[in-house]
Every structure is written in structure tokens, then in C-alpha cells.
């Protein structure tokens, strides 16, 4: 390649190190500070030796930990739970900590509801994310990506930059802000707010619960103000759709609009950002895969995008709550128990994927659960995310084809999001 990089290339397909079960601590934030390889090795051990196991909830300041949770680590179990919302309910929360009234004020959106109300709420915005509509905004996505990569080159004559702040972060943020009708002048504020909300617990981002609640209040107030404007000034945007929609014969309340808004801007920003970043990191580690893709970009793009999402698994887990007693793999779990669905583990399950440790851009079939396990809560923005990922890599291929990570990434300290805070890159 000829470019200086401290990223060690690897033999593609190398399994992670063995991790003894006694060393695994899903209920400790220290475990989530470990390298990805160790984490992958830990989940491989759990799939093999304890596919369903019980863990305490991580204690985060201000949050109510509540009871521990049953961790499902095998693909088939995660898939089953995703497809049986009558047993594995999204209510009252999708993270392992307990929902409190003050948190529900801002995070009580459709993602923590079950059908039929979940489906009625989802239908308000789902039209904006269909393949046909996403195809219509392709030109806008490409224009944004082209400008961001061009600016990255123009603003960094030394040909060194942080991929996250210059491309992977701004691209999905700008697109979802455009769709919501958020003015450009406010994009950076939205970016900061979403970082605090999903990065809480990471010392670089936020560990003060009062700050977390203030940011939640700020974004809620912003959403309410934007919605009030749309009540009198209709725009062709998602905020207007929320304001004008009726569910069960009633308009959404300001609180419902605010929590819906928070869900869309947070989910529409963070997950795609991390998929793009993990993708560039993987192409840096396995340069033969990049050469293969660049030589047939359009031909490989559909499978390449799916493999990047499998590899990244941007959302690490989702929680469900049992509505009845159930027995899985000989493990008895009771109504009211918390159950965690570990997508990161399911996407490396040796019983489901041939060579799961191989980053293979031509992988087919690839039934990954990177957008969730299907069913009612399948990722609403999956079509948009796929488009953004594809376009981002196409622009990199066109403008800086030899882009490579120069250092290991700064990883987000989080049990919930497989995040990267910074990834230094260079190009020739």
C-alpha cells in the first residue's frame, strides 16, 4: 500500500482468542472496555458453554439497574425471541436498566411498545423509509457524501483526518436532519445531543446523569418547538408527518412527538455512522477484500454492505421482557424476567455462518441480525442505512481509493452500541 499505518493486517478468518468463562463479566463496564477480539472470544465461549446465562445489570449513575437478565447468545434463540413479541415484549424498555418516569418522558417511543399501537405509530413514518422513497433521495445522499469526501481532502492537505468526524458521522446525521426538516445551523447541536444520549457512561462523552437528563430535555424541547412550527407551517418533512398524523383517531401529543423525534434522530445517526467506520477499519485490516470490491464495486456492493453490517453489528443487544413463563434450551425463565438478545453474538454464530470470523464481502447467503431479528421491530431505517453505506464507500473508492486507518480506533465504552469515537485515516 505504501501508506504508514499502525493497523496490523491479519489473516482473514483468524478466530478470536479463547476466553475462559470465569473471565466473562457482561455485567461489568470493565468488560465492555476490552478489545473487540476479547469480546468476540467471550461470546464464542458463551455460545459453546452457556448459550443462555444470567447476568447482573451494569450500574450506571442515575439509572435504576433493577434485576439482572437472561442473555441469549445463539442465533436461533435471538431469532426466535425477535419473532415472538407476544412472549418477548419490548415493553417497558429496550435497554437492560429499568425505565423510570423521568426517562420515559423522553424515551417512551414506539420502540418500547408492542403491536398494535407500535404498528400504528410506525406506519406514520414508515412510508418515508420504503425502498422506493429511499431511491428517490439517492441523489441527495450521493451529493452529501461527495461533498464530505471532497471537503475531507481539501481541509487536510497533510492527507490525514478522522473518518468519524469528517464523513461517517456527518453523512447519516445530515440525511436524517434533512428528512426531519432540521435546519443546517442546528445539525451540530443534534450531533452533540445524540452522542451524549448513546455515549452515556463513556468518560469522554458523559457520565453525569444530570447532564444526560438536561440533554434529553433540550432535545425534547427542540422537537416540541419544531413541531409547533410545523402545526402552522407545513413542510414536506417527517416532523410535519408526525404533527399531522392521527393514531386511534387522535393526534400525537407533544411528548409523543418529542420521543418519536429523539428515536429517529438518534437511531438515524449513530448506527450507520458506526457501520461505515467499522467497514473502513475492516478494509484496512483485510486489504485484499478492498481490492476485490474496488475491482467490481457495483457487482459486490449488495453483499458487501450486508457483510459490513454483520461485521459491525452496530447495536450490540436489545432487551425484551417475558410476558409468560418459558423454557429454552432447558433453561426456565419466568414471566417478568428480562431477556437480552445479543446480535453481536448471533452474527458470529458458527452454527449459522460458514467461517464467521472471515470478513467476506461476497458472503451469500448472509442472514445477519444487524438490523434486528426481523419481526415487528425490524430496523425501520434499514433501506436508508444500506444506501448510505453503499454511497459512502463508493465516494471513498472514487476520491481516495487507498484510504486506510492509521491507528486503532478509540472505541465507545458502551454495552449497547458498538461505537467508534475516532478513527484516524490517511490516503495518498
Swiss-Prot record:
SUPFAM superfamilies: Cytochrome P450 (SSF48264). Pfam families: p450 (PF00067). Heme binds at residue 379. Its cofactor is heme. The keyword Metal-binding applies. GO terms for molecular function: cholest-4-en-3-one 26-monooxygenase activity; cholesterol 26-hydroxylase activity; heme binding; iron ion binding; NADPH binding; steroid hydroxylase activity. One of its GO terms (biological process) is fatty acid omega-oxidation. It catalyses: a methyl-branched lipid + O2 + 2 reduced ferredoxin [iron-sulfur] cluster + 2 H(+) = an omega-hydroxy-methyl-branched lipid + H2O + 2 oxidized ferredoxin [iron-sulfur] cluster; cholest-4-en-3-one + 6 reduced [2Fe-2S]-[ferredoxin] + 3 O2 + 5 H(+) = (25R)-3-oxocholest-4-en-26-oate + 6 oxidized [2Fe-2S]-[ferredoxin] + 4 H2O; 15-methylhexadecanoate + NADPH + O2 + H(+) = omega-hydroxy-15-methyl-hexadecanoate + NADP(+) + H2O; 3,7,11,15-tetramethylhexadecanoate + NADPH + O2 + H(+) = omega-hydroxy-3,7,11,15-tetramethyl-hexadecanoate + NADP(+) + H2O. Signal peptide: none annotated. Its EC number is 1.14.15.14, 1.14.15.28. Primarily hydroxylates the omega-carbon of a number of methyl-branched lipids, including (2E,6E)-farnesol, phytanate, geranylgeraniol, 15-methylpalmitate and (2E,6E)-farnesyl diphosphate. Also catalyzes the sequential oxidation of the terminal methyl of cholest-4-en-3-one into (25R)-26-hydroxycholest-4-en-3-one (alcohol), (25R)-26-oxocholest-4-en-3-one (aldehyde), to finally yield the carboxylic acid (25R)-3-oxocholest-4-en-26-oate. Cyp124 catalyzes preferentially the oxidation of (25R)-26-hydroxycholest-4-en-3-one diastereomer. PANTHER family: BIOTIN BIOSYNTHESIS CYTOCHROME P450, P450, PUTATIVE (EUROFUNG)-RELATED. Belongs to the cytochrome P450 family. This is Methyl-branched lipid omega-hydroxylase. The gene is cyp124.
Amino acid at each position: 500500500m505504501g501508506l504508514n499505518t499502525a493497523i496490523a493486517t491479519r489473516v482473514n478468518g483468524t478466530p478470536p482468542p479463547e476466553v475462559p468463562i470465569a473471565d466473562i463479566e457482561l455485567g461489568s463496564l470493565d468488560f465492555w472496555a476490552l478489545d473487540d477480539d476479547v469480546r468476540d472470544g467471550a461470546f464464542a465461549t458463551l455460545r459453546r458453554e452457556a448459550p443462555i446465562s444470567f447476568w447482573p445489570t451494569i450500574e450506571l449513575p442515575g439509572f435504576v439497574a433493577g434485576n439482572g437478565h437472561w442473555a441469549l447468545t445463539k442465533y436461533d434463540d435471538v431469532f426466535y425471541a425477535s419473532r415472538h413479541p407476544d412472549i418477548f415484549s419490548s415493553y417497558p424498555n429496550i435497554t437492560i436498566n429499568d425505565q423510570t418516569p423521568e426517562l420515559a418522558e423522553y424515551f417512551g417511543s414506539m420502540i418500547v411498545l408492542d403491536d398494535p399501537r407500535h404498528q400504528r405509530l410506525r406506519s406514520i413514518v414508515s412510508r418515508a423509509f420504503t425502498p422506493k422513497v429511499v431511491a428517490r433521495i439517492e441523489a441527495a445522499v450521493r451529493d452529501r457524501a461527495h461533498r464530505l469526501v471532497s471537503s475531507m481532502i481539501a481541509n487536510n492537505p497533510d492527507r490525514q483526518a478522522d473518518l468519524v468526524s469528517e464523513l461517517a458521522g456527518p453523512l447519516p446525521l445530515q440525511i436524517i436532519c434533512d428528512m426531519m426538516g432540521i435546519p443546517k445551523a442546528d445539525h451540530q447541536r443534534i450531533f452533540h445531543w445524540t452522542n451524549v444520549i448513546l455515549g452515556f457512561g463513556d468518560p469522554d462523552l458523559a457520565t453525569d446523569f444530570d447532564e444526560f437528563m438536561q440533554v434529553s430535555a433540550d432535545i425534547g424541547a427542540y422537537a416540541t418547538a419544531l413541531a409547533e412550527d410545523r402545526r402552522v407551517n407545513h413542510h414536506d418533512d417527517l416532523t410535519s408527518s408526525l404533527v399531522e398524523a392521527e393514531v386511534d383517531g387522535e393526534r400525537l401529543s407533544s411528548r409523543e412527538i418529542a420521543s418519536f423525534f429523539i428515536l429517529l434522530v438518534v437511531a438515524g445517526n449513530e448506527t450507520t455512522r458506526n457501520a461505515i467506520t467499522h467497514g473502513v477499519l475492516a478494509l484496512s485490516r483485510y486489504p485484499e477484500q478492498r481490492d476485490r470490491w474496488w475491482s467490481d464495486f457495483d457487482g459486490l456492493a449488495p453483499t458487501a454492505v450486508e457483510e459490513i453490517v454483520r461485521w459491525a453489528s452496530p447495536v450490540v443487544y436489545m432487551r425484551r421482557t417475558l410476558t409468560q413463563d418459558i423454557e429454552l434450551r432447558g433453561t426456565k425463565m419466568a414471566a417478568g424476567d428480562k431477556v437480552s438478545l445479543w446480535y453481536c453474538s448471533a452474527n458470529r454464530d458458527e452454527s449459522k455462518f460458514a467461517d464467521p470470523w472471515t470478513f467476506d464481502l461476497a458472503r451469500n447467503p448472509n442472514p445477519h441480525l444487524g438490523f434486528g431479528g426481523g419481526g415487528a421491530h425490524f430496523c425501520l431505517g434499514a433501506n436508508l442505512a444500506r444506501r448510505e453505506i453503499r454511497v459512502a464507500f463508493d465516494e471513498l473508492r472514487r476520491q481516495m481509493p487507498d484510504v486506510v486507518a492509521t491507528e486503532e480506533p478509540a472505541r465507545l465504552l458502551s454495552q449497547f452500541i458498538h461505537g467508534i469515537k475516532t478513527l484516524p485515516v490517511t490516503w495518498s
